[in-house]
From Swiss-Prot:
Keywords: ATP-binding, Ligase, Nucleotide-binding, Purine biosynthesis. Pathway: Purine metabolism; IMP biosynthesis via de novo pathway; 5-amino-1-(5-phospho-D-ribosyl)imidazole-4-carboxamide from 5-amino-1-(5-phospho-D-ribosyl)imidazole-4-carboxylate: step 1/2. GO terms for biological process: 'de novo' IMP biosynthetic process; cobalamin biosynthetic process. It comes from Hyphomonas neptunium (strain ATCC 15444). It holds the Pfam family SAICAR_synt. Coiled coil: none annotated. This is Phosphoribosylaminoimidazole-succinocarboxamide synthase. It catalyses: 5-amino-1-(5-phospho-D-ribosyl)imidazole-4-carboxylate + L-aspartate + ATP = (2S)-2-[5-amino-1-(5-phospho-beta-D-ribosyl)imidazole-4-carboxamido]succinate + ADP + phosphate + 2 H(+). Belongs to the SAICAR synthetase family. Its EC number is 6.3.2.6. HAMAP family: SAICAR_synth.
Length: 259
């Protein structure tokens, strides 16, 4: 068997060379990290769930006109994606105060924000992904002025769609992190900005609309337990998997309790 060529390996995913020019295979690992990878664990079945959830959301975003790198799911852990040149920025959209926003500004966790906030962080693990401004982005050439405007517009469109999607499933979209890349279609000189990476409970804060229970990676960060179970509950509410947990024997019903 020919060994696939690894293009990039991150904390939660591996990118392999794709079967066709301009494509990659994105593999979702069970590895879970927090606090700049100082906290680590392997959670059985997490990669399967993130693959399915990200596929579901990216497919729906395509249907509402948000261009992204997703092509199709290949199997339980892999999907075929377009190869893009990643812009070295993490884009965070916030609807409710939580995480670093509460810490930095002293805003109580759970307070609704007057409007969605879009923040940018420079992708650099060694520097702990520092927050940057539009001036930094322009000065260091991380994105052009037009790309910056496109990213803001796309991020807010993603937020509008996902807020409604999750609200229909009884979930509040607190905030989320996304990434974008430049896609050179047919070797054209002008690249197109595409949503890339993934959208899953690893990259979103999701709270139960009635109880406020956390259904995302904060369960791992805060040692609450039930991480995979919470991700499975998100998938069930979105209609991705059946109540029985068809994708993995490691997925069981999420009760909201700690373990």
């Amino acid at each position: 068997m020919n060994k696939r060529r690894v293009i990039y390996e991150g904390k939660a995913k591996i990118l392999y060379e794709g079967p066709e020019p301009g494509t990659l295979i994105q593999y979702f690992k069970d590895d879970t990290t927090a606090f700049d990878a100082t906290k680590k664990a392997v959670l059985d079945g997490k990669g399967v769930l993130n693959n399915r959830i990200s596929e579901f959301i990216m497919t729906h975003l395509t249907s509402v006109g948000v261009p992204n790198h997703f092509i199709r799911r290949l199997n339980m852990r892999e999907q075929l994606v377009r190869k893009v040149d990643i812009i070295p920025l993490e884009v965070v959209v916030r609807n409710i105060a939580a995480g670093s926003l509460s810490t930095r500004l002293g805003i109580p966790e759970g307070q609704s924000l007057p409007r969605p906030l879009v923040e940018f962080y420079f992708k650099n693990d060694a520097l702990h992904d520092p927050m940057v401004s539009e001036e930094h982005i322009a000065a260091f050439g991380w994105a052009t002025a037009q790309e910056y405007d496109d990213i803001i517009a796309l991020a807010l469109r993603v937020n509008d769609f996902m807020s409604g999607l999750f609200a229909g499933a009884g979930i509040r979209l607190v905030d989320f992190k996304i990434e974008f890349g430049r896609w050179f279609e047919n070797d054209h000189d002008m690249p197109r900005i595409l949503l890339a990476d993934e959208i899953s409970p690893d990259s979103c804060r999701l709270w139960d609309a009635k109880t406020g229970e956390k259904m995302d990676k904060d369960r791992f960060r805060r040692d609450m337990g039930g991480v995979t179970e919470a991700y499975a509950e998100v998938a069930r509410r979105l209609g991705i998997i059946r109540e029985s947990g068809e994708e993995t024997d490691n997925v069981i019903h999420f009760t909201g309790g700690s373990k």
